Amino acid sequence: MMFTCTTPGCNELAHEHRFAAVRKGSAAAARARKRSVSSKLVRDKKGRSLRVDIHCHYLNRDAAAKLAHLNPSQYEPSVKFASALTREVNVKQMQDRAAKLSTIEVRLKDMDRMGIDIQAVSPAPQQTYYWTEPGLGAEVSRMVNDRLAEIVAKWPDRFVGLGTVPLQNVELAVIELERCVKQLGLRGVEINPNVAGKELTDPSLNLDRFFAKARELDIVIFMHPIGFTQGDRLMDHYLNNIIGNPLDTTVGTSHLIFGGVMERHPGLKIVLPHAGGFLGHYWARMDHGWRARPDCRTVIKKPPTSYLKKFFFDTITFDPEMLRNLIDKFGAEQVLLGTDYPFDMGEEDPVGLINSVPRLKPSEKQMIMGRTAARLLKIRR
């Protein structure tokens, strides 16, 4: 479909995005979901490749208000393990960036400034609310997902949605996952690397049912941390974000690999933020452990990196050489443009970062900028 960007202050030429707009409950949405995904790269009138941000967040203020009386911060590692100064800085950030988090018109201006055509928008990471009792968790998940669907329906040429599900109860999680995809037209879900401190492979959670359904529906799973759950040593200097976030992703991903989730459910489309945590750059140690120790081989029969290579990684490295190393190891086809918008630990110039990566071929650049994300998210011509 053709459209002229009407975002106030946008000086770009008209864009061209030919993909299906997903609208809640419409016959057109049902037909669109059945159409095959085009392998062609979507381009705008300037001829450049589509740019898709896989890592960006929206704060649902109604959901936050509904749970405010329960004091959510006592359950959130990012707040629980934070110094007084860190909490003060975070409060100011939430005030200063309130419009960016929840006002779409402001977001659109920033997207145009950053050169982003489409956001795969996901909830603010704390809005998974795994600490709630299951019924309440399911109710709040529906609130969050319904709002994301409304945003996509109103601006279908700029957004696709990644929802949330109550992983504290796998039956309710599977029900909401199906609703997200089949009724709301969302393209995937955001999860945390643990469920209120329990590993994703914890037998009591029985999350194989969730992963099986995600594979069946062929959706994206975006696994985003909210600080490290044992963050006592990381309270000062914002270390529970700087170190704790990539650490929690590293631990959660390692359990998915060593616990056999990736082996039992081949074809899962899991995206790791912050360039995959520490595994993206220190992967060899897990392979050595697998070769050296029988307790690393109790479930999986192949080296851990053979599974790690099936994950997708965003570009948030803040350094062209680090991003080059990630691409060298896992391939440009596994790396996706990400910003962590609108938080202060995000990448303000994602296009500039990718363009500054040495020895990057044009075809690789296109994959990272949006080609692969468009395929994963079923963004159609």
What are the residue ranges of the model-derived segments?
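Mid-to-C-terminal alpha-helical segments outside catalytic/metal-binding sites
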Residues: 1-50, 54, 62-118, 146-154, ...
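Catalytic metal-binding/acid-base residues of hydrolase active sites
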Residues: 57, 226-227, 276, 342
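Short acidic/glycine-rich loop or secondary-structure boundary segments that cap or lie
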Residues: 61, 231, 279-283, 288, ...
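Active-site gating/metal-coordination segments in enzymes
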Residues: 117-259
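A general structural motif
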Residues: 250-253, 292-297, 315-319
